[in-house]
Swiss-Prot record:
Its EC number is 2.1.3.3. HAMAP family: OTCase. It comes from Staphylococcus epidermidis (strain ATCC 12228 / FDA PCI 1200). The keyword Transferase applies. It catalyses: carbamoyl phosphate + L-ornithine = L-citrulline + phosphate + H(+). InterPro entries: Asp/Orn_carbamoyltranf_P-bd, Asp/Orn_carbamoylTrfase, Asp/Orn_carbamoylTrfase_sf, Asp_carbamoyltransf_Asp/Orn-bd, Orn/put_carbamltrans, OTCase_ArgI. One of its GO terms (cellular component) is cytoplasm. It is found in: Cytoplasm. Carbamoyl phosphate binds at S62, T63, R64, T65, Q89, R113, H140, P141, T142, Q143, C277, L278, R322. This is Ornithine carbamoyltransferase 2, catabolic. Keywords: Arginine metabolism, Cytoplasm, Transferase. Transmembrane segments: none annotated. SUPFAM superfamilies: Aspartate/ornithine carbamoyltransferase (SSF53671).
């Protein structure tokens, strides 16, 4: 097994939101993940967490986050233990504080995917072990590591990249893209209707990070100016988990913000890549997709099937990179 080369001394540190790290630390984790990806491809052992036990707490369902944390843990030599919403009592029969103190006695690290940012913050405060945010309503830092790793793999650099996010500007992905991009020197544009712009608290954090690291953040409802010269176009579902009652309203607001061939052409570039954190409503091959078609007559929502499957799309590289970047976070903070 090769000796571990950590980007920075992050041992014992939690990752609850992007700006828990410096920009240099954040990109260092991306570079570390790229090294671990090579180890995986080469079959080089990298069991840096041999004998460690990892708790995977899930209030929300998951495909990529659960799979990524599970495989990453096993590859690193650790044992992952899944605790779903029916297994844990967070704030119901037992306080988050008490739960955290118990889990901290038994596990070496804790992942949490759920609703409240306060919950993951309390887990970190009271457990005494590193805690990693697998998604909350406010932030999605492990997704950002994978997203910006995918961009760096494609272009070779991050500083100066033009990234345009199109769609609902009031979700965790939009918040995190702004802040992480600003920390990495990326020019981030959030293209969204005026009624869905990011709240000031998140925008102001992003602006502060941009002033520190040389990135930029802009918000607009003008699709033409937002996507011009974009190296990356990113979108997400129009309705997040728990917002299903908003479908009709969001379709009305966001139908013109669909990522399609016309939008890609507006970039003026031939090498623009398309990203999506998944799952995506790009066809009718799911129960949701069929239901949306029956109710609204739509066969595609935030992205057309053509673009999703096109040479521009990097969505499955992006999904794979969840595992490599999560592995980097765990190894750097526990190894």
């Amino acid at each position: 097994m090769k000796n571990i080369k950590k980007p920075f001394d992050l041992k014992g540190k939690s990752l609850l939101k992007e700006y828990d790290l410096t920009g240099e630390e954040f990109e260092g984790l991306i570079d570390f993940a790229m090294t671990l990806k090579k180890y995986k491809q080469q079959g080089t052992p990298h069991r840096y967490l041999e004998g460690k036990n990892i708790a995977l707490l899930f209030e929300k369902t998951s495909t990529r986050t659960r799979a990524a944390f599970t495989v990453a843990s096993i590859d690193l030599g650790a044992h992952p233990e899944f605790l779903g919403k029916n297994d844990i009592q967070l704030g119901k029969k037992e306080s988050v504080e008490d739960t955290a103190k118990v889990l901290g006695r038994m596990f070496d690290g804790i992942e949490f995917r759920g609703f409240s940012q306060k919950t993951v913050e309390q887990l970190a405060e009271f457990s005494g072990v590193p805690v990693w945010n697998g998604l909350t309503d406010d932030w999605h830092p492990t997704q950002m590591l994978a997203d910006y790793m995918t961009i760096k793999e494609n272009f070779g650099y991050l500083k100066g990249i033009n990234l345009t996010y199109v769609g609902n500007g009031r979700n965790n992905v939009a918040h995190s893209l702004m802040v992480a991009g600003a920390m990495l020197g990326v020019n981030v544009r959030i293209c969204t209707p005026s009624s869905l712009t990011p709240r000031d608290v998140y925008f102001n954090i992003a602006k502060d990070q941009a002033s520190n690291y040389g990135g930029s953040v802009k918000i607009t409802d003008n699709i033409h100016t937002a996507v011009k010269d974009a190296d990356v176009i990113y979108t997400d579902v129009w309705v997040s988990m728990g917002e299903e009652s908003e479908f009709e309203t969001r379709i009305h607001l966001l139908k013109d913000y669909q990522v399609n061939r016309k939008m890609l052409n507006l970039t003026g570039k031939v090498d623009t890549i398309f990203l999506h954190c998944l799952p995506a409503f790009h066809d009718t091959q799911t129960e949701y997709g069929q239901d949306i078609f029956k109710k609204y007559g739509l066969t595609e929502m935030e992205v057309t099937d053509e673009i999703f499957r096109s040479e521009h799309s990097r969505v499955f590289d992006q999904a794979e990179n969840r595992m490599h970047t999560i592995k980097a976070v765990m190894a750097a903070t526990l190894g």
